């Protein structure tokens, strides 16, 4: 009597899609209020001035300005927004 053994089943072959975490706006970049600066799990980066922290630890701008990364107490990295004179379109000299 001919028999064929049943094939084994693989336990691998699954993976989840990446979560698209990380820094979205780097130091020195201009941002508008509401722009997302960092998506993270936990507080690897902490909120500084003119920055908010979402319930999923997303850091976002609360004011227009320039992104600045700096180190604070206990070696924590903070992200702040430095409001500055926005680079407006230069006026054309009158002839």
From Swiss-Prot:
Keyword Transmembrane: no
Pfam hit, one: Ribosomal_L27
GO biological process entries: translation
One cellular component (GO) term of this entry: cytosolic large ribosomal subunit
Record GO terms (molecular function): structural constituent of ribosome
Keyword NADP belongs to the record: no
Keywords: Ribonucleoprotein, Ribosomal protein
Region (Disordered): 1-22
Similarity-based family: Belongs to the bacterial ribosomal protein bL27 family.
Entries under HAMAP family matching the protein: Ribosomal_bL27
Protein name: Large ribosomal subunit protein bL27
Organism of provenance: Rhodospirillum centenum (strain ATCC 51521 / SW)
Organism classification: Bacteria, Pseudomonadati, Pseudomonadota, Alphaproteobacteria, Rhodospirillales
């Amino acid at each position: 009597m001919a028999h064929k053994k049943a094939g084994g089943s693989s336990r691998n072959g699954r993976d989840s899609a990446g979560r698209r975490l990380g820094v979205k706006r780097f130091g020195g970049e201009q941002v508008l209020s509401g722009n997302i600066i960092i998506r993270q799990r936990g507080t690897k980066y902490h909120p500084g001035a003119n920055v908010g922290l979402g319930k999923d630890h997303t850091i976002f701008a609360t004011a227009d300005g320039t992104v600045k990364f700096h180190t604070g107490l206990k070696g924590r990295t903070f992200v702040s927004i430095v409001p500055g004179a926005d680079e407006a379109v230069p006026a054309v000299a009158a002839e």
